[in-house]
C-alpha cells in the first residue's frame, strides 16, 4: 500500500511513499512503523502480522534514516485516511508490483526543476527516490524466492 503525501507535511510534499514518519523518544522503529500506519491510514496493528524488515536507507534531502517493515493482513483492512498527512492511498497488487519494471528516465518536477529519475509507473502513481529503492529491494527478494 502506497500513499501520496499532502502539501501540508514538512518533508516530501505531494510525493508517493509508504506510511511512516519520525520515531518518538523511547519508541522502537518497528513500533513507530505501526503507529504511523495507524495515524496516516487508520490500519490498526492488531490486524497486522510481521513479514520482516528490509534494509534501512538514508535520505540526505530530509536527513531521515528509513527503517522498512513489511506487514501482512489476512483480511482487507479498512482504510481511514488522515487528510492532513495523506492525500490518497494506492493499493498495488503483488502481481502489479512484480510485473512492473523500473523506467530509468522519468521526468519529475522537484523544487521547481524538471529532472529525470528512475521510477516505477503503476496504474495510478509514479514512485521514485527512496520509495523506488525500497520497492526494488522487495522485488529482488520476491524474485529470489
Show which residues each predicted segment covers.
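N-terminal strand-loop-strand
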Residues: 1-18
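Unchanged
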Residues: 22-116, 120-123, 127, 136-145
